[in-house]
Regions:
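Extracellular S/T/G-rich loop segment that most often corresponds to the catalytic His/Ser-adjacent loop
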Residues: 1-27, 31
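Noncatalytic accessory or regulatory domains flanking protease catalytic cores in secreted, cell-surface
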Residues: 165-175
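Long, contiguous C-terminal modules that act as interaction/assembly or targeting platforms
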Residues: 12, 42, 131-132
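Alpha-helical metal-binding/catalytic segments enriched in His/Glu/Asp
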Residues: 29-40
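Secreted peptidase-domain scaffold signal
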Residues: 73-160
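An often Trp-containing, charged/polar helix-loop segment at the C-terminal end
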Residues: 41-66
Length: 175
């Protein structure tokens, strides 16, 4: 496969039509999306929520040939949808937003994940789940390549049995 570069149409310094590539071309579009989402939400400004909604809506073009395992590293998280499609789900999808603050060492276990009964077939849940995690990491530029001082892991799966946990302990949360 041959790599084909498709640039963004713009204007050169002398006013002529030009094309170019780079992340800075996405800045005006993402800024407009963020402003549109904020206006549509009509609530206190929450940059992490807006970032999460934009990122969650992004997808790759069908003709994308970059391997799935390399996409985020090579081309980012994809192309975000427009504001109405970000804010309003289709009739066959739902978006669950969980917001909280975690102190160092804390964890959240969601043991009763709200799955609609219509997705239950022969004792198994069917459907697609897309999880998007957005957080505000602790950054320390003096730490070189380890400047990001926050690591969060997301694990999704099922248990054979459900065990009740003592959620009164400081480091265990179950919203």
């Amino acid at each position: 496969g041959e790599t084909v570069t498709t640039g963004v149409k713009s204007f050169s310094k002398d006013g002529k039509m030009a094309t170019g590539v780079g992340t800075s071309f996405s800045t005006p579009r993402v800024t407009a999306l963020a402003a549109g989402i904020q206006q549509e939400l009509s609530e206190e400004f929450d940059p992490l929520l807006i970032k999460a909604l934009i990122t969650h809506s992004a997808s790759y073009p069908k003709e994308m040939t970059v391997p799935v395992t390399e996409r985020a590293k090579q081309v980012g998280f994809g192309i975000p949808k427009n504001v109405p499609d970000i804010i309003y789900n289709s009739p066959y999808e739902a978006t669950l937003i969980l917001r909280d603050s975690l102190a160092k060492g804390d964890k959240i276990d969601i043991m009763d994940f709200p799955m609609p009964q219509c997705l239950l077939k022969d004792g198994y849940y069917t459907g697609q789940i897309i999880a998007t995690l957005v957080y505000d990491p602790v950054l320390d530029p003096s730490q070189g390549i380890e400047y990001c001082q926050s690591n969060i892991d997301v694990k999704f799966g099922s248990y054979d049995t459900k065990e009740e946990r003592d959620t009164s302990k400081r480091h265990i949360l179950n919203p």
